[in-house]
Amino acid sequence: EIIYQRSMMKKGSSMSRNNNSLALKAGKELKKINGPRVAVFEVGGFDTHAAQGGIDGSHSDSLIEMDGIFKNLEKGLGNEMDNTLIVTLTEFGRTIKQNSGLGTEHGYGSAIFMGGGLLKKSQVYSDWPGLKNKDLFENRDLNSTIDARSVYASAMSKVFDVDFKEVQKEVFWNDNLQNLSDKLFKT
């Protein structure tokens, strides 16, 4: 851990880089005419098998870090936030109920958080089945009702101005995905 922290320090500085300062810098770079089109941030700590906590736990800490990234990107982007899409990505969801260690296990369904001016509106877009046991996958997980790849393919199509079918073919190997662009993004 100490080697990682020191490797992220600027020579002559006592301040190590963190996602918040990187997000601010990334926002400033992304808004440049010839700047990059994509920035990627990693937020760990969501694999909370034990001691997940509530408003004070490690899960909350990770969500606060995500919020800081969103805020600093917006600050760095300024008015260019109107032409921006922020998309979160995860490899797994979490179970609904806590385990005996006050954490959660890997789950089936999940959520994708998005922000930015390219979104059609503030919304929860879902085919929500509910939280009753009969509605859960294997009586423990959110049921996955929308293929996350449909969201990602639609986002790529919108942001990079590439035909959805082309993204579907070249990135997702012609899998049967739903184009959600008209439901999620401004035209």
What are these regions (language model features)?
Residues 1-187:
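Ligand-binding pockets and gating/stacking loops
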